[in-house]
Amino acid sequence: MARKSLIQREKKRRNLEQKYHLIRRSSKQEIRKVTSLSDKWEIHGKLQSPPRNSAPARLHRRCFLTGRPRANIRDFGLSGHILREMVHTCLLPGATRSSW
């Protein structure tokens, strides 16, 4: 189980990313439209004004049961070992066991 502070930090980053998403997207579109270099630099300065944690690159996928940041399966939102345990106990319908 991940520490609760790390999970809360991740939630805060996700909220910030949603809050500043439109600002980032609009400024990136403006950079593509503008041809003069000085205007591009000015718009790029606006792009740097939102907080760092609002950047989508700083988000991590976490297992929604344990909060584990590694070995996540995107389709299920679970880490690999939790997914395997749930398949073995027949908690995920339609998933088949693999024998290693």
UniProtKB/Swiss-Prot annotation:
List localization entries: Plastid, Chloroplast
**Keyword set, alphabetical order:** Chloroplast, Plastid, Ribonucleoprotein, Ribosomal protein, RNA-binding, rRNA-binding
Q: Which cysteines are joined by disulfide bonds?
A: none
Q: Which GO terms describe its molecular function?
A: rRNA binding; structural constituent of ribosome
* A Pfam family hit: Ribosomal_S14
GO CC, sorted alphabetically, is:
chloroplast; small ribosomal subunit
- Write down the Gene3D superfamilies for this protein, in alphabetical order: 1.10.287.1480
The further comment given in this record reads: Two forms, which differ in pI, are produced, S14 alpha and S14 beta.
Question: What does the function comment of this entry state?
Answer: Component of the chloroplast ribosome (chloro-ribosome), a dedicated translation machinery responsible for the synthesis of chloroplast genome-encoded proteins, including proteins of the transcription and translation machinery and components of the photosynthetic apparatus.
| UniProt cross-references to HAMAP family, sorted A to Z | Ribosomal_uS14_1 (MF_00537)
Under the subunit heading, UniProt states: Component of the chloroplast small ribosomal subunit (SSU). Mature 70S chloroplast ribosomes of higher plants consist of a small (30S) and a large (50S) subunit. The 30S small subunit contains 1 molecule of ribosomal RNA (16S rRNA) and 24 different proteins. The 50S large subunit contains 3 rRNA molecules (23S, 5S and 4.5S rRNA) and 33 different proteins.
Q: Supply the name of the protein.
A: Small ribosomal subunit protein uS14c
Species the sequence originates in: Spinacia oleracea (Spinach)
